[in-house]
Amino acid sequence: MVKHLIAMADNSKLLVLLFVILIVSLFGYDVKAESDKAAEQAALRVANEWLQLVDNTKYDESWNSAAEFFKSAVVRDSWRQTLQAFRSPLGKIISRKVKSKKFTTSLPEAPDGQYVVIQYEASFENKKSAIETVTPMLDKDGKWRVSGYYIK
């Protein structure tokens, strides 16, 4: 009797496993898509924190917290001067909303890696409509940091 119950339990486990496999194959659970979404969320958090530095004219701090790739391409003084020339005249941020975000592993003129390109619809005191693009990347130490910023 005990052997019969064990055999039934093993069959039940097998049926449950087969059912799970069937459901997963029917609905196509995509592990990569889930990891891309997690990366997008982590990158979005970092981008928002970084934008607060820029919004508060903490340009040196924004450079300090940027990705190594960014810092090797732009010296701190140049970064500060560029933001003072182009970002400061826009005035205070009025509103900012995520327009799109996309995970990618390659970008033009950048090393292969993990990036999330985030576009924001923004409104400033002196520019009612702008698109800000912030590109965090997974840095060598495993932390997300901003590697690019562009205002259009």
Model-derived features with residue positions:
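Exposed beta-sheet edge and beta->alpha loop/turn motif
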Residues: S100-K152
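Bacterial N-terminal signal peptides that target proteins for export
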Residues: V2-L17
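Short solvent-exposed beta->alpha transition segments
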Residues: L44-R45, D60-G113
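Bacterial N-terminal signal peptides
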Residues: L17-L26
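Short, low-complexity N-terminal intrinsically disordered segments enriched in polar/charged residues
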Residues: F27-K58
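Second-shell loop/turn segments in exported
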Residues: E34-K37, N48-L51, A66-K71, E121-S123
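Alpha-helical hydrophobic membrane-insertion segments
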Residues: L5, S25-G28
